Amino acid sequence: MSMEEAEECSAACGFSLTCQEDGADLGDGVVDDDDDGDVFLFYNAVAAADDEEEEEEYVEQMVSKEASFCCSSSSSLFDAAAGDGYGDGDGDGDWFRQARLAAVKWILETRGYFGFGHRTAYLAIAYFDRFCLRRRVDREAMPWAARLLSIACVSVAAKMEEYQSPALSEFDAGGGRVFCSDSIRRMELLVLSTLGWRMGAVTPFDFLPCFSSRLHRHHHGGAGAAGHGAAAAARVALNAVGFIFATAEAGSVLDYRPSTVAAAAILAASYGAPLTKEALESKMSNLSPSCLIDKENVHACYSMMVGDMNNNRRSSKRPLQCSDSNEITTTSTYDSVLVDDVTDTAAFAATAMNKRLRPEPPRIR
């Protein structure tokens, strides 16, 4: 991919991609039955606790929605990349994995820097993976092209999710790299066009509140979602976040459906010690009684999460700490940045106050 491919978009670089709306047209959150299904569904844990049928309907709708964004299980980003020449040169093809890992780490660090929500970071990683599945990035252009792509993906995700997104000049590319706002905006447009302007993908965070609440309720004999039960479910969901981002670092987020990742993360965060396949399938019935989630894929994803956790425990002399004395047992870039408090994390809503430090990058070309 070269910058020339984006030149056709240069005429549009004088405008902002941020939608100028104040939310007045959203009403009281009531969704018109005539909507085409592109609106996001929101999970109300307290209401759903009293109506498991409604809860299951929510999961069913989210699973159906995620299907349109998922990659075929037989097609991996890394397999496709290798087949498109990403593995040429040194014989092992690790350079693309390393470039992607650096991009994901930068995205997670940027999430912590600006105080973005978890969903924003995950969407940015998903945009990056989807883009690389459709377009080839030349090795000679790495790592600057991957960093420019990372900035564009985070910027678009922030415009999708945050109440206020940073100005393009606020993003610190790191490593002495400097990108002008026009270059970032052109890359944003290239990302949008490459992904067909379909940016509202489902993420594991759309399932976490529901899954953690259901698992806690069944585990404690039908305890309600209020009070101590809600706090306990929120703690499990918070710990699951670390597993989700550790998995995102380890491989493409397109390899597993968001519902699969969410289920595996909740189970890993809830039980820690490896469960047998039979025990895992038994626990899964509490998450989705109608078997909407593929058990084989959940088991594979869960095994990877727990395996990485055990490997990290053996290689680390002390656990990593995060805010509010909560420990994330996986070792990933996510662990080194501050997480939101438990209440905000359980809600998985963008924080109303975007706590933003303002970097001062050098003058850009």
Swiss-Prot record:
Alphabetical GO biological process terms: cell division; G1/S transition of mitotic cell cycle
Keyword match Cell division: yes
Entry keywords, A to Z: Cell cycle, Cell division, Cyclin
Cellular compartments per GO CC: cyclin-dependent protein kinase holoenzyme complex; cytoplasm; nucleus
Signal peptide: none
InterPro entries: Cyclin, Cyclin-like_dom, Cyclin-like_sf, Cyclin_C-dom, Cyclin_N, Cyclins_cyclin-box
One example GO MF annotation: cyclin-dependent protein serine/threonine kinase regulator activity
Family: Belongs to the cyclin family. Cyclin D subfamily.
Name used for this protein in its record: Cyclin-D5-2
Species in which this protein is naturally found: Oryza sativa subsp. japonica (Rice)
Gene name of the encoded protein: CYCD5-2
